[in-house]
Amino acid sequence: MMASDRVRKRHKGSANGAQTVEKEPSKEPAQWGRAWEVDWFSLSGVILLLCFAPFLVSFFIMACDQYQCSISHPLLDLYNGDATLFTIWNRAPSFTWAAAKIYAIWVTFQVVLYMCVPDFLHKILPGYVGGVQDGARTPAGLINKYEVNGLQCWLITHVLWVLNAQHFHWFSPTIIIDNWIPLLWCTNILGYAVSTFAFIKAYLFPTNPEDCKFTGNMFYNYMMGIEFNPRIGKWFDFKLFFNGRPGIVAWTLINLSYAAKQQELYGYVTNSMILVNVLQAVYVVDFFWNEAWYLKTIDICHDHFGWYLGWGDCVWLPFLYTLQGLYLVYNPIQLSTPHAAGVLILGLVGYYIFRVTNHQKDLFRRTEGNCSIWGKKPTFIECSYQSADGAIHKSKLMTSGFWGVARHMNYTGDLMGSLAYCLACGGNHLLPYFYIIYMTILLVHRCIRDEHRCSNKYGKDWERYTAAVSYRLLPNIF
């Protein structure tokens, strides 16, 4: 893509509106962003994930298909010689052209909604921010524009799904789970294809060469990505599309398909399935309602686009984030009223903490600190950082509200919600609890990784901030 085609804008201020201040080169802070070199520990982790993550997804899905979602039974069969990985693999449904057609129609439909239907909901929904929005400043000092229309895409998709189930009957509501393992093949094909395309594109025709980072290691470059914001044309942004669509839009449809399968098999839908559908739908709708805010999060602001995001959004997210609903298809559980109420309360309290924490940060950014947090004017620490174009920018780190309790209370709320999904499945099997285990590892790692980047970005200013807010996730604990 030629430079004249790039969608970018240079600002004199930071994302929160502060003004740029020129400094002497000797006094400038180090340039922020991902490191140019990779250590052996990170490289080992990358190779391990490249080899192990696809196997883990297949193992969990096949364990549900052949062992009612038990993890121990297939392992015992393997240990006792009653089965081999080859025999388990052979018993699983294979790729089908019917599933390929379903998935191709699905992805194409989401591309059309993303590219061809400009957002109109922001014109009629008070408080909703959609349409063309600016992203955060990249390490090279660029600010990309995005068409934020995820909520609209989600609503159109689900209205059509409900109309089909109730009136048109073009396809069965169980179409997703009925083709679940063949669809796993299809999502893997797309995940590897888009990751490989992004890898090659970074070498041949990067969107913004200033934001590309080559570590010198092919495995790390492929896994973690080279381009920061790869695009095709002016508006098709790989990060925004593949993270939100087709994965997260599909999340609630997959859960609805699970519920329909429960109804088909047993003649009823359990309260546990309803809880999982409702709590996860709240999270999904929240994501799309706040999609403009998502443009300022770590996925967009720090992560380059590689296999980690490309394959992860196509395969890992839709198959492993929905494990609770899949488990309940094979193991229908009717929870007691106190148990169901406890799960609901935990999930809603977790969502409240997650949402209010993010709202406080967004409000603080939009008003440049001229607002009220918990009835008081927020306190903050002013920081500075340097982008690759040499400009010095100001930023403010809030130390009030939930952000004064711990540095990542939004993650704390997220983990509470994740635990609620798992507790809805009872305690007979480990598999539905994989999600809380994974999310704990992911978010703790993100805490450490994000803070390492912030330390590099802000230097001594970050030390002042961590002295003011001592804990990461849990006050007085961690």
Swiss-Prot record:
One of its GO terms (biological process) is cholesterol biosynthetic process. It is a multi-pass membrane protein. It comes from the Eukaryota. Residues 1-28 are annotated as: Disordered. GO terms for cellular component: endoplasmic reticulum membrane. Its EC number is 1.3.1.21. It is found in: Endoplasmic reticulum membrane. Pathway: Steroid biosynthesis; cholesterol biosynthesis. It is an enzyme of class 1 (oxidoreductase). Pfam families: ERG4_ERG24. One of its GO terms (molecular function) is 7-dehydrocholesterol reductase activity. NADP(+) binds at K361, R365, M398, W403, N410, Y411, D450, C454, S455, N456, K457, Y458, Y465. PROSITE patterns: STEROL_REDUCT_1 (PS01017), STEROL_REDUCT_2 (PS01018). The chain crosses the membrane at residues 43-63, 97-117, 180-200, 269-289, 309-329, 333-353, 424-444. Keywords: Cholesterol biosynthesis, Cholesterol metabolism, Endoplasmic reticulum, Lipid biosynthesis, Lipid metabolism, Membrane, NADP, Oxidoreductase, Steroid biosynthesis, Steroid metabolism, Sterol biosynthesis, Sterol metabolism, Transmembrane, Transmembrane helix. It catalyses: cholesterol + NADP(+) = 7-dehydrocholesterol + NADPH + H(+); 7-dehydrodesmosterol + NADPH + H(+) = desmosterol + NADP(+). PANTHER family: 7-DEHYDROCHOLESTEROL REDUCTASE, DELTA(14)-STEROL REDUCTASE. Catalyzes the last step of the cholesterol synthesis pathway, which transforms cholesta-5,7-dien-3beta-ol (7-dehydrocholesterol,7-DHC) into cholesterol by reducing the C7-C8 double bond of its sterol core. Can also metabolize cholesta-5,7,24-trien-3beta-ol (7-dehydrodemosterol, 7-DHD) to desmosterol, which is then metabolized by the Delta(24)-sterol reductase (DHCR24) to cholesterol. Belongs to the ERG4/ERG24 family. This is 7-dehydrocholesterol reductase. It comes from Danio rerio (Zebrafish).
